[in-house]
Structures are given as structure tokens and as C-alpha cells.
A protein has these predicted regions:
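Short glycine-/small-residue motifs
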Residues: 56, 139-140
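Short, flexible turn/loop "capping" segments at secondary-structure junctions
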Residues: 3-5, 71-76
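Short beta-strand/turn micro-motifs at beta-sheet edges
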Residues: 1, 64-71
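Core segments of cupin and vicinal oxygen chelate
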Residues: 14-57, 61-62
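A short local loop/turn or secondary-structure capping micro-motif enriched for an aromatic residue
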Residues: 65-68, 100-102, 146-149
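Vicinal oxygen chelate
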Residues: 15-19, 76, 81-137, 161-170
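N-terminal beta-strand motif that seeds the catalytic metal site of vicinal oxygen chelate
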Residues: 1-19, 81, 146-147, 151-170
Length: 170
């Protein structure tokens, strides 16, 4: 058995323009600034939070001469960052908020799983995807299925459990 990790603590991103990214993450996603650290070379790190933890997201300006957008979104090391909202109502409000802010979706809204996109391995979550100013892929989701006992299901058992979830039996 490996390390007993409780949760992902935070995600740190290199950004091309701290002010632009800061506006996006505060005005569009609702982050709050915990603190900002400017370094003598002019680079900066900003700690952002969604709740009462010190930080959930860290924005760091790229070192001088580094273009964080040089690699396209598919070549980057972070595939996506997913943000959970409380429920379907919060999901729909988030969708409307992004639309009002002019953020274009790259996928969704959709439901992952047999009741939505047909994926037997899907989570049952409602999701939509969009990019931040540097092209990082972001997801907002709600209603992810929980896996009993934290164990992986065999595929057939998983499909049956998913159907039970869809039917409101789980």
C-alpha cells in the first residue's frame, strides 16, 4: 500500500501574464487572493483560495525569457485541472457565469457515463471544459459518483452500479 494521501493540496501554474491570469481566476472562477510574493527579478507568485485553506491554486510568472504558451495545449504537462461545484444548480450557475464573462467552452456541458456520453467507465458527473488565458484546460463538474469502499469495480459490476446511480438507487 502506498502513501495515504488525503487530497490534492493545490495546483501551481506558470503563467505568461500574472495580472491577466489573476483577473481570470478571481473574476471568472471566484478565487480569493491570499497573498502575493514579488521577487527581486520581477517575477511573482500569487496564492489563491476557494475556501478557508491558505491556497488551492498558485500562479507563478514564468522566468524571464520563458514562453509558457510556446507548447500548444496538447503538449503541456498538465492535462486539465477540475473544479468541483456543490450540485446541479451550482453547475448551471457556473455555466451561465462563464457565458456572461465571454468564456468559450471547448467541450460540454455533458454527462460522463452510460446515461450521458455512453462511457461505461464514466463517473456520472456533469462537466464542461474551457481554457484559461494561457490555454490550460479547465473543467467544472458536479455530481461525481462515489465508488463504494474506494475499490475499483470489475467492468460489468461498474456498469450495474452506474445504472443503479442513474436510477437513484445509490
Amino acid at each position: 500500500m502506498g502513501i495515504q494521501i488525503k487530497r490534492i493540496g493545490h495546483v501551481g501554474l506558470l503563467v505568461s501574464d500574472v495580472e491577466c491570469s489573476l483577473r481570470f481566476y478571481t473574476e471568472v472562477l471566484g478565487c480569493k487572493v491570499t497573498n502575493r510574493n514579488k521577487r527581486p527579478d520581477g517575477s511573482e507568485t500569487v496564492f489563491l483560495r476557494f475556501d478557508d485553506w491558505h491556497h488551492d491554486l498558485v500562479l507563478s510568472s514564468a522566468p524571464p525569457g520563458v514562453d509558457v504558451t510556446a507548447a500548444g495545449p496538447r503538449e503541456r504537462l498538465i492535462q486539465q485541472i477540475a473544479f468541483e461545484v456543490e450540485d446541479r444548480d451550482a453547475f448551471l450557475k457556473a455555466l451561465a457565469h462563464l457565458h456572461a464573462k465571454g468564456v468559450k467552452l471547448i467541450n460540454g456541458p455533458l454527462i460522463h457515463g452510460i446515461e450521458g456520453d455512453g462511457n461505461l467507465g464514466g463517473s456520472g458527473s456533469r462537466s464542461f471544459y474551457f481554457h484559461d488565458p494561457d490555454g490550460n484546460r479547465l473543467e467544472t463538474f458536479a455530481d461525481m459518483m462515489r465508488v463504494p469502499n474506494g475499490e475499483e469495480f470489475p467492468r460489468q459490476e461498474y456498469a450495474e452500479a452506474m445504472q443503479a446511480y442513474v436510477n437513484g438507487e445509490r
